[in-house]
Amino acid sequence: MTPTKQTTLLFFLLIFSIYCALTIGQSWDEETELLRGKITLEYLLSLGDVDKKILYREYYSPIYWSLSYLLTKIFPSQFQIEAGHIINLFFSLSVIFGIGKFSKELFNKKVGKLCFLILFFYPIFFGHMAMNNKDMILAL
């Protein structure tokens, strides 16, 4: 496959994933995740003075929650869910590119491209790319 065709394929894959991230809608726990991010950001900015207990704080990355909350606050409130999906998509695509580069270093260029395509088209991973912020960051 020529580099022009590869770039075109990559462009359409990225556009398709952005389209899916924007049209997927709100999941049942996204408001809770934003609230966790708000509480964690208050904790970090107060240097530990505001310490509210958050369920599962020790199991998942509270830094990611606060970063996600901070970035979604940049956008208007009616677009916070879509902004969160784009942020999750960015980290998920980073995982895909990272695993592709890692397998390219371990094996060869063909295996790296194959791993990239398999992971991108794997339905469970692709379905969770935009809405699941817990598992994708652990894969990173």
Stretch-by-stretch model annotation:
Residues 4-9, 78, 99-121:
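Transmembrane-helix signature of polytopic, membrane-embedded enzymes
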Residues 9-14, 87-90, 111-125, 136-140:
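Membrane-embedded helix bundles of polyisoprenyl
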Residues 11, 83-106:
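Transmembrane-helix motifs of polytopic, lipid-linked glycan transferases
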Residues 22-28, 46-69:
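Membrane-proximal lumenal/periplasmic loop motifs of glycosylation machinery
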Residues 58, 62, 66, 76-94, ...:
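Loop-to-helix entry region of an early transmembrane alpha helix in multi-pass inner-membrane enzymes
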Residues 68, 72, 96-104, 123-126:
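Hydrophobic transmembrane alpha-helices
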